[in-house]
Amino acid sequence: GLLDVVKGAAKNLLASALDKLKCKVTGC
């Protein structure tokens, strides 16, 4: 349902944010 879509989007945003942060810290 809609909640699943929202959860999926939030998870994707969190994952990409963590990736960017990791790139800043470790230099990818």
UniProtKB/Swiss-Prot annotation:
Secreted among keywords: yes
The keyword Secreted is assigned to this record: yes
Pfam families: Antimicrobial_2
Major place of residence: secreted
A single Gene Ontology CC term: extracellular region
Cystine pairings recorded for this chain: 23-28
InterPro entries tied to this protein: Antimicrobial_frog_2
Tissue: Expressed by the skin glands.
UniProt superkingdom: Eukaryota
Keyword field: Amphibian defense peptide, Antibiotic, Antimicrobial, Disulfide bond, Secreted
One annotated GO biological process: defense response to bacterium
Compartment(s): Secreted
Family per record: Belongs to the frog skin active peptide (FSAP) family. Ranatuerin subfamily.
Physiological role: Has antibacterial activity against the Gram positive bacterium L.lactis.
Protein name: Ranatuerin-2AVa
Organism: Rana arvalis (Moor frog)
Higher taxonomy: Eukaryota, Metazoa, Chordata, Craniata, Vertebrata
